[in-house]
Structures are given as C-alpha cells and as structure tokens.
Amino acid sequence: MILVRTLLLWLVATCVHAAPPAFAPVTPGRTLAFPADYGAHPDYRTEWWYATGWLKTPDGKPLGFQVTFFRSRTETDPANPSAFAPKQLIIGHAALSDPVLGHLVHDQRSARAGFGLAYAGTGTTDVKLDDWSMRREPDGRYRVVVRAGELSFTLRLAPTQPVLLQGEAGFSQKGPQAGHASYYYSEPHLQVDGDVVHAGRKQAVTGTAWLDHEWSSQVLDTNAAGWDWTGVNLDDGGALMAFRIRARDGSTLWAHATWRDGAGKVTQYGPDQVRFAPQRTWTSPRTNAAYPVATLLTTGTTQWRIEPLQPDQELDSRRSTGAVYWEGAVTVQRDGRPAGRGYLELTGYVSAMKL
C-alpha cells in the first residue's frame, strides 16, 4: 500500500511539473516528400492512415471493408524518461460491411506506443497494434492485417496511379481560420487481393481500395460538430474526394473537393463550389442518430448521387476514440448513370466530434 501511494504521488508530481508539448503547426508551402511522408509524423497531434474499399468474393458477393490506424500525440512531457509514459497512442478501427447481415461487423483496439507492441514508424508506412498492422513494402504495395473476434483479413493493396495531393499541394484547409488545416494525400484505385475470415468462413477476395493519409495539430473549429466526407474510385479511372465541415447548427463551416479525371487532370473546388444535399436519412436504433446516408453531392456544375450499400453502417468506437459514426460503402451515379464506388463517412451526428 505504501508503494502504491508512493507511485501515485510520483505520478501526480510528474504531471504537475510536466511541460506541455508544442505540437508542430500545419502551414502552406510545405512540399510533401515521398517515401518519408508515407510514414508517421510524431511531432503533430493527430494522424491517421485510412483504407476503404469494395471487395468481391468468388461467388460475386460484394463486401465493403474499412481499416484505420490513428496515431495521437498526448500532452505528456516529451522529456519524461519513463518507457511507460504514454507519449503516443495507437488506435485501430476495422469493419466489414456485408449486405447479407444488414449491419457492420467491426472491432477496435488502442494502446500506448512502446515495447514493440504498438508503434507508428517514420520513413514509410509501418503501423502496428498488437496483431493488427499496415505496412508499405519496398515495391509500394501495402500489406494490411487485422485479427479480431468476428472478422479477420489479410489484404494486399497495390498502387496503380500516382499519389493524389489534396488541397494546395497537400495542404488541406479545414476551416475559415488559417490554423485549421492538415497535410493530406490519397492513393485511389489500389488493386486488392487477399482473404477475409468472417462468420467462421475464409474466402479469397479481390477488389479496389482507396487510402488516405492525413496529419495535423488543429483540424476543427470550436464551432464544428463533425464532417461529411466521401472518397470514390470512378469507373473511368478518375478519383473524387469531397468533404464538408458542419457547424453545430447544421450549416457548412467549410467544404472542399478534388476531382482527378480519367486523363489525370486535377480540379480543385472551393467552399462555394461544393454542396452536400441529403436525399434520405437512416435512423440508428442504437443511438437514435439520423444519418444522411443518401446524398446529392455537387462539385462545380457536376452532380453525384451517393447511395449506401446498406443503410446500417454505423460504427461505435466509444471504447477507443469516444465517438460513434457512420462509415459505409457507397455507389455513385453521375447524371443518372453509374460512375463509381467508394466510401462515405458521417461524423458528429450522435455528439460533436472531438479530435
């Protein structure tokens, strides 16, 4: 008991005298450099690697998948010499969308970085969380491994196109204030192969994926509730990314879109050129949140109709990030014709999102 009290007093004293860290700022004009920027940026507050995609089983059945690794720098004094000091946290989310089930199968994990069990490496993508991992191989392919209770998968994601820099050469504004921004790039049209274990059955899968990598120290305005985001692999070889940051009253604080057409031409759309118009909502029986799962997205003069693979794609991550959000596979039409497939993310509909 004396030892416990001594340890508690030491921890309190450490916290009282600890110097808060200075998080690295996100500023325009920085040139993203690869392969280094594939890796972690531990001086920034928040970072994530996010892969989503559509898979097909041998019998032609569609599945959606999502795996995200978060790295979060805490406010622990960086000069703290203890190997147990939680200076960096690693969090993982994984989900499988199966229309036969009618809802997501998902899991989550979190741990402090250290001891080789959880880390986000610099220099290239190399993230590990127990037996979950995402690693970029020397040939550019990603290997993603998830082992969980109700789902497991081992996937290989092979790039087929150049990196797509979002915003201003990778500087992505997220609000009216200069500091609300991130560094952000995407890798659309990743060819996928591997296997999925679900409902006690192992199946080979192929498909197409989208990978985002984003890092920041201050993303959201204090009046922000959350965001609507979509990333779409277009059938003509193009790629579309769009988002809006929502205020607490439901209005749009900021919006942006990037469209790379099939010939490789990139067009950026500012806040006044991007509009999300909900067409249909789905109300969760678990949280009572109403999500706009079908949306009409306008970028410039082009309209894209977004429809979900299934309505219930809500993910409860309160055990790791404290948030509940909707993250689901979607199809996209342009001018009434099929145009592509991707993912839609809807956050802040249960409670205001905090990063």
For each feature predicted by the language model, list its residue ranges.
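N-terminal signal peptide c-region/cleavage motif recognized by signal peptidases
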Residues: A13-C15
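Structured soluble/peripheral alpha/beta segments that form catalytic or ligand/cofactor-binding pockets
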Residues: A19-L355
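Sec-dependent signal peptide recognition
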Residues: I2-L9
